[in-house]
């Protein structure tokens, strides 16, 4: 048995050497983390005692003051079937913003995702599909470059420029006020990052829940300190907004390519590139909470301001293998690729944070090995405590005073780490999750350890960290209630309802009336009636339809909707039902516009389809900036003069109304303005006193020649009341008298 004792003694002394080595490394790393803790708490206390005593905290209402600038959301999508629709639906119904477009990058060899995106684009005019040039999966950066190229093409065709470019994944749940925050800052800041707070699962889902622990501390303390000391903010890859200046600089720097296609963490890479160019970066923790409710708590010890932070929510991987894959990709990108791409700088402060980024390659191994050593030491301690005559193996540690001091210091630093983790997890998720984060420490260390091994293995296999391919991990998406179907073509609905034949549809498609969409064109050609068109449009959009008399709408109800809003969305308020405003429209209203309408009128809005021309004539009567002859008044006066019977006047009105068309419809149908971009221009037009046509010419969107041509087509398409009266048998003198009487009213 002597040999066994020798082996045990050798193991014991080897354990001591390993423990000493680990203790020294952990002490250095612990001091590093403790320094960040001290800076954070000193800065927080100082700001609370000085800044916030002199100045009130900024209210979220300030975010509403700037005009909505156009923002582009970039979403790379590889094998994201069934996710994009939910994201667009949730964004449309929850975002307190209207002037945004979503560009989804897909791949030619991913038809299922493309099909999903096509269906979403049919319902949401602000969602656009981008097909990458190369088959997937390429890198996320390559996909984003394709998306950015498509955005620049869209800007040229729509004749306007986006002010900000936002990174998101398809699984992200975007905070309702996120775009307003970006809109408020994007003119002054070049990189804006908001926190990421993962969704909770059941407490037994340890893998997924380790993400809430790490992000709570990272985005609650570490990144704010980094920004304060170094002025540099690493992008999280989601919830990041780049200014136009930043994107232009990146494109110029990369000769037309903004994102490094060989990088697995292009977001991390860009933060340094922009910093090198002297651009300003900011990490924003901005709560949306009423001052009166600031002290309210949803969970025990949960902070009201922290838990109402504008942030990105998403589910993170819930299985051990997917978490290891994802984190190994992060390690390759930040540690190995980052070390090769971003050399040490002349700034000691920035170098310090580069060191903190890269020490993970060591600390992840050290933390796990330290756990294993601690388990062995605890077993030895249990042995000595349970057996009175046990050998005192731990005496080899107690004999070194400096080692015991080092171990006690490390113990104190470890307790501090646990306390810090509990504090920051509790702030957002409540005390229960804060305490459970202690139990998840070992599991998180195991995941990080295995991710380190996998990252190291991949780098060694490829020989160059920049050759490792994008290993996309899948995420869950929160369930979204509501109908996410795509829109059926209008022609198909008319065929199914046996309103027209296939031959008539083919003829209508070949001989479409210039300036009109298919429905209006078939109405002009006499193939369908206004009622049949309204019924088909209502079926297409899943709403009801009805016929209205705009002149019978109470003026008190008209006052519910500002003229700029009614003209922008081409709607009329019809009635109130249980505090819900019912509005009429001649066409389907997309979910983004419907949500914007709800915000602008201050009450829930529902819409119905009405007969062709009834909204146009109603808008001209109630809201038009420059009123011409009132056609309804001319008919009324003709009846009063007994030049027409009431029956004749009614028939003339039924001929007149369906042949009235909006200028914007003709303009977009002719292709002079992208239909998905018209909303951006209409938002800007809300603040102008000019007619829409003159406004577009003044803004350089269209030429005067184009305006004249569109107005000419509008006049040719529309039927004038004067011509109908002459056709009904009135002479020119009678029509002139009616015009004169109309002007005098």
From Swiss-Prot:
Sequence intervals crossing the membrane: 8-28, 362-382, 393-413
Keyword Cell cycle: no
A GO term from the CC aspect: plasma membrane
MF annotations from Gene Ontology: ATP hydrolysis activity; cyclic-di-GMP binding; glycosyltransferase activity
Membrane-related topology note: Multi-pass membrane protein
Localization: Cell inner membrane
Pfam families: Glyco_trans_2_3, MshEN
Organism: Escherichia coli (strain K12)
Source taxon at top rank: Bacteria
Keyword Membrane applies: yes
Keyword list, A-Z: Cell inner membrane, Cell membrane, Membrane, Transmembrane, Transmembrane helix
Functional description taken from the UniProt entry: Required for bacteriophage N4 adsorption. May be a component of the phage receptor.
Protein name: Bacteriophage adsorption protein B
Chief place of localization: membrane
An example Gene Ontology biological process: protein secretion by the type II secretion system
């Amino acid at each position: 048995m002597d040999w066994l004792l020798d082996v045990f003694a050798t193991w014991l002394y080897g354990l001591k050497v390993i423990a000493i080595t680990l203790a020294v490394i952990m002490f250095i790393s612990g001091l590093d983390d403790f320094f960040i803790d001290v800076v954070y708490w000193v800065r927080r206390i100082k700001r609370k005692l000085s800044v916030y005593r002199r100045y009130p905290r900024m209210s979220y209402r300030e975010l509403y003051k700037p005009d909505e600038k156009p923002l582009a959301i970039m979403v790379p999508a590889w094998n994201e079937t069934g996710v994009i629709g939910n994201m667009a639906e949730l964004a449309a119904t929850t975002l307190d913003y209207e002037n945004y477009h979503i560009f989804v990058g897909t791949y030619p060899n991913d038809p299922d995702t493309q099909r999903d995106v096509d269906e979403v684009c049919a319902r949401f005019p602000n969602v656009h599909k981008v097909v990458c040039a190369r088959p997937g999966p390429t890198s996320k950066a390559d996909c984003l470059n394709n998306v950015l190229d498509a955005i620049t093409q869209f800007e040229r065709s729509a004749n306007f420029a986006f002010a900000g470019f936002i990174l998101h994944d398809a699984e992200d749940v975007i905070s309702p006020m996120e775009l307003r925050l970006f809109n408020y800052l994007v003119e002054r800041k070049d990189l804006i990052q908001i926190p990421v707070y993962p969704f909770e699962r059941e407490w037994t889902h340890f893998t997924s829940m380790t993400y809430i622990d790490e992000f709570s501390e990272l985005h609650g303390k570490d990144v704010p300190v980094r920004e304060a000391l170094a002025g540099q903010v690493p992008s999280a890859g989601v919830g990041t907004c780049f200014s136009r200046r930043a994107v232009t600089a990146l494109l110029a720097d990369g000769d037309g390519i903004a994102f490094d296609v060989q990088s697995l963490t292009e977001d991390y890479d860009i933060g340094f590139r922009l910093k090198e160019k002297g651009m300003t970066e900011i990490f924003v923790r901005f709560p949306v909470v009423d001052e009166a409710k600031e002290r309210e708590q949803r969970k025990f010890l949960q902070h009201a301001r922290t838990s109402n932070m504008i942030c990105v929510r998403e589910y993170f991987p819930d299985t051990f293998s997917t978490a290891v894959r994802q984190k190994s990709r992060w390690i390759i990108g930040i540690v190995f690729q980052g070390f090769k791409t971003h050399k040490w700088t002349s700034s000691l402060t920035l170098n310090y944070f580069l060191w903190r980024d890269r020490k993970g390659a060591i600390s992840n191994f050290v933390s796990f090995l330290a756990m294993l050593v601690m388990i062995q030491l605890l077993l030895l301690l249990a042995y000595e405590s349970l057996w009175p005559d046990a050998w005192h193996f731990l005496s080899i540690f107690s004999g070194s005073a400096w080692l015991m001091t080092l171990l006690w210091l490390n113990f104190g630093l470890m307790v501090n780490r646990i306390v810090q983790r509990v504090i920051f997890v509790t702030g957002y998720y409540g005390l229960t999750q804060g305490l459970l984060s202690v139990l998840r420490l070992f599991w998180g260390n195991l995941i990080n350890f295995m991710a380190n091994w996998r990252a190291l293995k991949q780098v060694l296999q490829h020989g160059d960290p920049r050759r490792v391919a994008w290993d996309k991990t899948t995420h869950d998406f929160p369930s979204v209630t509501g109908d996410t179907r795509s829109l059926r073509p209008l022609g198909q609905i008319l065929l199914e309802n046996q309103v027209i034949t296939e031959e008539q549809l083919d003829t209508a498609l070949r001989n479409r009336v210039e300036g009109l969409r298919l429905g209006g064109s078939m109405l002009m050609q006499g193939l369908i009636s206004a009622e049949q068109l309204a019924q088909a449009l209502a079926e297409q959009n899943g709403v009801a339809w009805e016929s209205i008399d705009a002149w019978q709408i109470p003026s008190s109800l008209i006052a519910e909707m500002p003229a700029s809003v009614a003209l922008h969305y081409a709607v009329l308020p019809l009635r109130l039902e249980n505090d819900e405003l019912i509005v009429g429209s001649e066409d389907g209203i997309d979910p983004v516009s419907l949500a914007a309408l709800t915000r602008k009128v201050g009450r829930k809005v529902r819409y119905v389809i009405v007969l062709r021309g009834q909204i146009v004539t109603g808008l001209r009567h109630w809201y038009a900036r420059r009123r011409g002859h009132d056609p309804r008044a001319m008919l009324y006066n003709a009846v009063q003069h007994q030049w027409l019977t009431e029956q004749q006047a009614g028939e003339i009105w039924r001929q007149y109304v369906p042949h009235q068309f909006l200028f914007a419809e003709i303009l977009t149908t002719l292709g002079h303005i992208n239909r998905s971009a018209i909303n951006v221009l209409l938002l800007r037009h809300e603040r102008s006193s000019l007619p829409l046509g003159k406004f577009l010419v003044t803004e350089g969107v269209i030429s005067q020649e184009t305006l004249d041509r569109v107005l000419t087509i509008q006049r040719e398409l529309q039927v004038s009341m004067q011509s109908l009266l002459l056709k009904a048998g009135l002479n020119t003198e009678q029509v002139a008298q009616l015009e004169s009487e109309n002007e005098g009213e």
